[in-house]
Amino acid sequence: KKCPKAWEYKYIQKLKGTLQANTHLKRGSNIHLLLEHFEELLEYLKTKDIQKLDFYFKENEISLEDFMNSEELKIVLEFANSELGKDILYKKSVREQEILFDSEFNVFLGDRKDSNFVGFIDRVNISDDSLELIDFKTGKYKEPNFQKYDQLMVYAMYMFKRYKVNKIKIRFVYVEHNLENSLELSPSMIEFWSNSLKNTVTEIHNTKRFKKNKNNLCPWCDFVLICDPKLIKNRKDYDKIKDQIPKEILEKIEN
């Protein structure tokens, strides 16, 4: 909905962004990484077994000293010591980061056999008769009336069927602010969201042309060099990222 064209590039054409992640995005990515592997991080802090941090060093070329002094680690540990952090990170969880609606779940996709639904979720906490689906957020806090729950509601459809629980709580957790927006769901809501998903799938299949939604964020889009290269000059850090731009595209931008 934000930009159908960017969605097409990523999920239909399966293109990858042409620029490296900027510092802000990398910071957010590392915070997510530490939270998703919080148990391993705790083990390292207890045992000093460096292998427990393999998940982090595979993604970052950084010394142990720099890691221990990093802003990302400080943010995660402060969150872990907060009341909200304790309520999330120390509960029993299951590794269900990737959600795939395969043939067993095709009831949600209707008669379409050529549709795949894949989703990713940061953390799933589990108790006897309920689940918590947790989406960690970095950056600015979003006020409750602006929070959209659609994506996690669709994930909840999968979880109700897989785990046979009576209640699922969706939690959008803003790590740096120790705030959350949450919503509780029951199995009775599945039918509505199942129909909503079917309609979305049908709409995608019937779309002949995905339109661009031009806005002020276009210069930072992963696909700006494919979609409208000249827009990248509107970035304040343009001079710093020019060396990442392929020569033939840079010539078109500069001319």
State where each predicted segment sits:
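Short microdomains enriched in Cys/His and/or Lys/Arg
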Residues: 24, 232-255
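Short, polar/flexible loop-turn hinges at active-site or ligand-entry regions and domain interfaces
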Residues: 15-22, 43, 141-143, 208-212
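C-terminal, charged and often intrinsically disordered regions of DNA end-processing helicases
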Residues: 1-27, 252-255
